[in-house]
């Protein structure tokens, strides 16, 4: 079983990036754009990545540099 304590740090990081990079988008809009980008640009099905890889992809999509 995956560590249930992973969800809040993941969600906090996602919320921080969302509010800093795309504050005008609704969550559904942001996720739709991200999922399409993953599919078309990265050739990845977003169903499969664990949270670490998901966040790496999300940061790349949002243009977040390491250390930001």
Identify what each model region corresponds to.
Residues 40-68:
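Short, charged early-sequence alpha-helical segments and their helix-coil boundaries
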Residues 1-27:
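N-terminal acidic leader/helix
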Residues 27-41, 45:
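Catalytic phosphate/metal-binding cores of nucleic-acid and nucleotide-processing enzymes, i.e., regions
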Residues 18-21, 34-38, 61, 65:
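Generic structural signal for hydrophobic core residues of well-folded globular domains
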Residues 10-13, 17, 33, 57-60:
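Charge-rich, solvent-exposed alpha-helical interaction surfaces
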